[in-house]
Amino acid sequence: MVGSQGLGAIASHFVAGRNTGALFHLWSLGSSHVHPDESGTMSVTDQLLSNNAAYAASFNGPLPLPPAKHVAVVACMDARLNVYGALGLDEGDAHVIRNAGGVITEDEIRSLAISQRLLGTKEIILIHHTDCGMLTFTDDDFKRGIFEETGLRPAWAAEAFANEYEDVAQSIKRVTSSPFIPHTDQVRGFVFNVATGVLEEVTG
């Protein structure tokens, strides 16, 4: 059984070895909307808002609504996977849809249908990666742990998987078999290697 300790063990996989980095101080920018945590340390959100101020100062917009390269990417939310960097994309080039695992669920089908039918995308790229947290647990264990903590079972599936290559293949089939996705002749799947940065295509 997983329980609260089990869920904690699962969560620890995601944070092990994380580098915290230096904190930025919004006070130096004269911000009046800073929200320190209980220890008095600046929140990450406030640090990122500081970054946004610098970003907005040199921002060139607005860009056209349809993606310039007419492509949609579905990728894992893992922080080590920089989709724009890995594919050489710029802002405005593609729709980038991210979730835990990069799996195809009803919500990804919804987004892809809107992307193609209303915003002109034609190609779809699916990206999983090595050392994924979704390899470290099962759906049953996850639901059991949540139930033991909350007394509730989530209606949604976590979509954990035992092999990232097999799950990419399954994701391709889910996209190409959907009646809601009109363009399925250019649906390709890849596994991103978090150690080398290389994308390996999954075929068959």
Residue map of PLM features:
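Divalent-metal-activated hydrolytic enzyme cores
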Residues: 33-35, 40-68, 101-107, 114-119, ...
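Ordered, amphipathic secondary-structure segments that act as subunit-interaction surfaces
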Residues: 119-129
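Divalent metal-coordination and catalytic microenvironments
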Residues: 52, 73, 97, 126, ...
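Residue-identity detector for glycine
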Residues: 3-8, 17, 21, 30, ...
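Short helix-loop-beta junction
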Residues: 88-96
